[in-house]
Amino acid sequence: MKDFYASPQNRSLPADRHTKAFPTPPPLTANNVVSVLFILAALVVFPLWSNGRYDTLAQAKLDFFVPAVISFLILSAVALLCRILVHPKRVLRRAEPFTVSDAMMLLFFAAAVVSWQYSQWPEEAYWGSDYRHHGLVILAMYTLSYFLLSRFARRLNWVPVVFLFGALPVFWLGLQNFLGKDPLGFYAKSSAHFVKTCISTIGNWNFYASFVCMYLAVMCGMLLKSRKTAPTLLYGFGVFSGSIALICGSSDSGFVGLAALFVILPFFICNWRQLAHYAMIPALLFLAGKAMHFMVAGNGGVTKIPLRGFSKMLMESIAGWVFLAVCTGIVVFCLILHKIKPDVSFPVALKVIWGVVLAACTFAVLLAVVYFSAINATAPLGNLEKYLRFNDHWGSTRGFAWIRALREYAGYDTLQKLFGTGADTAKHLFMPKYYTAMMRLGNAVFENVHNEYLQYLVTIGAVGMTGYIGLIASVVTRSFRRAGKSKLALALGLAVLCYAVQGVFNITQTMTTPVFFTLLALAEACCRGIDAAGRAKPSQPSVAKMPDAETPAASDIMQAFGKPV
């Protein structure tokens, strides 16, 4: 690529472009350091934390996360007090703006408090149900960590690298479990029910898939906007390792989150290099599938989790080799075009066309579901029936839970419709009222709605669900609007969005939801940091918007600490 700084309109810029053309970042404060410690605890230590048993893993995660947030609060308060005592005017002058995201977070928590006050099961609404433990206590921890991180977490370019290497041990354990091995002895200590459905140090494979979804979103976002060889290889490895983990989880909800990633990323592709990096993602996914095929074959064909769905297709389908070759060819072709014409920028019209096509496809699918579910409910659909006909069997019997949850919500009084019956009390909707029906359906017991949004609707009401959806929408919107200035904002916004999409088919719990709220808070913090940098007055004339809207050529780690390379 031609040197941007050599263009005629920018020849007046200072020679030392890394240190003089941009405002010097403010010095690190004690609050910033404390936030770094909490981020490391939440993204590296927490996913690995366990007590060696799947039966009580949720409690172990709760026992780690709650003290971590309380410690974060205490240390942040002490650090802030010391700063106020030393530089009172400087600290008080830097008041953080109150955003829509903040308002939605408070609304979400306030609804949980009100629902607890009026709940028929106040103790359960406070602590959460057995194994889930997702009551008012952990919602309070999410709220505290959100406000602390969004105010004090800055210079976050190191986060994707730490997240990448921190997740690798989790994925390695997941791979070993998938191959029928038990290196930590979890299965020997856990009951048979959990042995069948749990993997790694995360627990249920659906929870594991939600963790992988967030990881892949961060890696893909960083890969898409990478400009140099080293970060491209690094985040490419991250996508490859995450793809292997996703296959090991063998959860449809995880692939739904990945599908959301594929349809959103094209809106951020601006040139041939980024298109090449986009094509690299499915290429790495198919490559991971074939690598898993050989690993399973080397293991004698033994897998703990039966091969099914997309995992089976990626591993065993001959077409996977064809797709791998096609995607690899696209990558090479686009890189050659970028080498020939590095200054080419794709027109906005292409993104508009993609948006129209996406909206049309979404509408067509919804129309098909409505038609085959309500108008022509007897038409034979074959294998498509489990996708296009919404009934009790839809979505691995999730339809049963959704229909009953909405039926119960319709019978709520006004107060319950607004604030629900108490956080994590959904099991009282199903047990014992629908126990017999659940046994007839497939010997499956539902203690939750298997949909995060409906779960919040019936437990903390329409007010709580509105706060939750509004929080996600606000953070994602703010992140995407700033994606042109920071690839980290794009990556974190994608992580929030992918978790939100897979949450349609998953549940909130203490194994991965704390990681989600941490990434959500970091996305908000990243947006605030970008806004603060925009308000700062540079010592030299500011640089015009660069191609790819990235910072000057510098490594992510050195950028994180504001040092020139």
Q: Model-found features: residue ranges?
A:
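Non-cytosolic membrane-interface motifs at loop->transmembrane helix junctions
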Residues: 61-62, 126-135
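Membrane-interface capping segments at transmembrane-helix boundaries
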Residues: 84-86, 336-343, 528-539
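Transmembrane alpha-helix boundary signature
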Residues: 79-95, 114-127, 182
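Alpha-helical transmembrane segments of multi-pass inner-membrane proteins
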Residues: 2-14, 18-50, 68-80, 106-118, ...
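TM-adjacent membrane-interface loops and short helices in multi-pass inner/ER membrane proteins
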Residues: 204, 396-446, 460-464
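Long, low-complexity, intrinsically disordered segments
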Residues: 549-565
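Aromatic-rich transmembrane-lumenal/periplasmic boundary elements in polytopic membrane proteins
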Residues: 132, 173-188, 366-425
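Short, hydrophobic transmembrane alpha-helix segments
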Residues: 49-64
